[in-house]
Amino acid sequence: MRILGIDYGDSRIGVAISDPMGWTAQGLEMIKSKDSLKKAVLRLSEIINEYSVTDIVIGYPINMNGTKGPRTERTEEFIKKISDLGQFNIIKWDERLTTVSAHRTMNELGIKASKKKGIVDTMSAVLILQGYLDRIAGNKKS
């Protein structure tokens, strides 16, 4: 069982993958989506097949007041595109403050600002996926 974590953005898509047991999330890569969403979706298809992905957890942008905005609509369109890639569950995960947490973590690790741009999306995908993995692990214990 492998679960894919995605932080979708108009310019970049952060990607993370779970370990085979579904306990931990590891950053996989950042895919540029600004120039060609079609190429980005093709790369995701390759990853899904390579890792035999059973579930995809995608960061779902909700405003701080709980409403949906333009980013939510774009994410919904992206979800429609990836839902055609295979047989897997797609889980929408509240991503509020994920990018803030990713920046905070990178600051604590001493990562320079010039390097953050290429890492923040993948780090956000890791945080999204790990949040989901922690939730399902907690549900299994109950």
Curated annotation (Swiss-Prot):
Could you identify this protein by its name? Putative pre-16S rRNA nuclease
Q: Which UniProt keywords apply?
A: Cytoplasm, Hydrolase, Nuclease, Ribosome biogenesis
Which top-level group of life is the source organism from? Bacteria
Q: Where in the cell is it found?
A: Cytoplasm
The organism is Ruminiclostridium cellulolyticum (strain ATCC 35319 / DSM 5812 / JCM 6584 / H10)
As recorded in UniProt, its EC number(s) are: 3.1.-.-
A biological process (GO) of this protein is: rRNA 5'-end processing
GO cellular component, alphabetical, reads:
cytosol
High-level lineage: Bacteria, Bacillati, Bacillota, Clostridia, Eubacteriales
